[in-house]
Amino acid sequence: MNFSEKLQQTLGKAIKDASNEEIYAALLNTVKEAAADKGRNISEKGRKVYYISAEFLIGKLLSNNLINLGVYDEVRELLAANGKDICEIEEVEPEPSLGNGGLGRLAACFLDSIATLGLEGDGIGLNYHLGLFKQVFENHKQKETPNPWIQNTSWLTDTGIGFDVPFKDFSLHSKLYDIDVTGYENGTNKLHLFDIESVNENIVGDGIAFDKNDIRENLTLFLYPDDSDKQGELLRIYQQYFMVSNGAQFILKECEEKGYALEELDKHVVIQINDTHPSMVIPELIRLLTARGISMDKAIEIVTNTCAYTNHTILAEALEKWPVDYLEAVVPHLMPIIRELAARVAAKYNNKDVQIIDEWNRVHMARMDMHYGFSVNGVAALHTEILKDVELKPFYDIYPEKFNNKTNGITFRRWLMHCDKKLVEWMDKYGVGEFRKDASKLEGLLAQIDNEEALNALLDVKQQNKTALKEYLEKESGIVLNDNAIFDIQIKRLHEYKRQQMNVLYIIYKYLDIKAGNKPKRPITMIFGAKAAPAYIIAKDIIHVILCLQELIKNDPEVAPYLQVVMVENYNVTMAEKLIPACEVSEQISLASKEASGTGNMKFMLNGAVTLGTEDGANVEIHQLVGDENIYIFGESSDQVIEHYAKSDYVAADYYINDADIRKWVDFIISPEMMKIGDVRTLLEIHAELIQKDWFMTLLDVKDYVQTKERVFADYEDRMSWAKKMIVNIAKAGFFSSDRTIAEYNRDIWHV
């Protein structure tokens, strides 16, 4: 029985007579069966990787699974023959609320590639019921509401497995749900998500407010609950320990079932710690091994040879440090082990910068990972060099053999084959070769760089994608885009270092320039998508400024025909899949030295956008691949920025006082036009922040940014030249396949 026959049997009625909801449910169950039939990926070496992460931003799964199972076209045609549109079926599916930004999306891409390469490897995380939050805009401000996603018809499978997780005053029994991870034309792996049976979604009050002390009911409600107070920090510790204790118990259970001796755990298991959230897996594994009779020395040796750590940030505040008394309040049984680990480090090294427990009695999670793991990797070439030379230099001096780079990547199944089917058709027509499993074949596109027919066809694909975005946004939110405008897009987590505020200053420049009578040759549409953490006031204030500008420009008849600002609500994977194929100018404007890698830059590049960015993160490698003519780089270098911080010689007020243009742009934030629309206090605070602090040096780079962006828009008018830039970017994007990244992890770290 083929897939279509199984689908019809599961549905139990004629497709033409079924609702979209019924068809979706039948497809989901048929895909689950097909994934089971594919069988699990099994390592010939008897070795398995477990990828532990606080978040997995997996996106909707139906189409991705149909593509990986090789039945997407078959299903699409079957539905069409019965008067059904597969795109409408896809809209029925809720997006899982299991992630936030690049960290979680990377984890999802990695799981896809691990399965596609046929490696034995599973993800381990938590089953958040309400996600980060659903973003709505009210009075030009972000408001957070719960984002429930779990339905009776779900990709989650109840495994019947659970473990007891001990805390100081009580224990909780977990419940394990699995989601199948299908490999492209290969076997399947699993994403293991742990939950509690007593979770209660009804305890959430106004917005996303809830009792943070009620651990038995709130533990798996939200991803990254507000940690701006002690209760929030304690809840984060509860969550992290619940995740790693379940993960560690599950790993040992699997090993024992396979008949492995736990004394040889490191021969059969590798645990990849994705950022610092899962770091307590190190002392927890040691605790569980010593409880089974293994000596402390041996347990430490085993765990050190089992765990590997990926660093994802250069921002010091993101390297988690928990007060000892907080850990004592939640997991006192771990503290003797953590103290033992810290004592061994202190006995060997007298440098305070490498101590696990610092002089303020805080436990540094990343330091524990580096001392008691066998690998430390950065996620882009520049990032890894900064870790070795600056941020983690004391550790590199001790353990140079542990440090390695693994430049991030993205899965082309989702970010090309699923979300940009028209571009795939163009690639197939112009003879790229089998890029679906070998992304390096994209280089074959360079043969078309002087083919005017191919160039025009590529421009037409982009135009069709812009029109598709226009239609989608109008249908979903009533926003009307001008699809003849240039689409300039910045979509990423809202953070000062990503510098959405600098984009704001460009918009102000352009608004004032148009008001002065300087009309652009072509309309410009600036699109933002971003959520700000609920307690991150400045980030929320930046959203407020963007939304105020959106209204100001929309209602100004002198400017609206030439400039549009749109901030999409509740930016998520589904929205990214619509925005990225339509993008023409990719905004990657973080302060040099602050973005570890970025993966949005790769997705845009793959879909034919041209990058406007700083020499930061993976932008550096994009620049090296495409050359000076096919990317727009501005701003000071990472070395210059690091020197500014070292010397404390950047003073934002000097730029404000000494440059009339910068002063005009910044002051417009508190102009009568803006004050009439926005909240006065908020606008005053952002204005003061830019002049008095500006920790991420917006005013340092803004003039160069404005001038470079004007050059981008001028160059855009030479359509053939622009199409050639598009081809080069697409052709060179093959390096950024997560299949390549995972192959490198396996070659150098996992050896699965």
Can you name each region flagged by the protein language model?
Residues 1-752:
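A conserved ligand/cofactor-binding region detector
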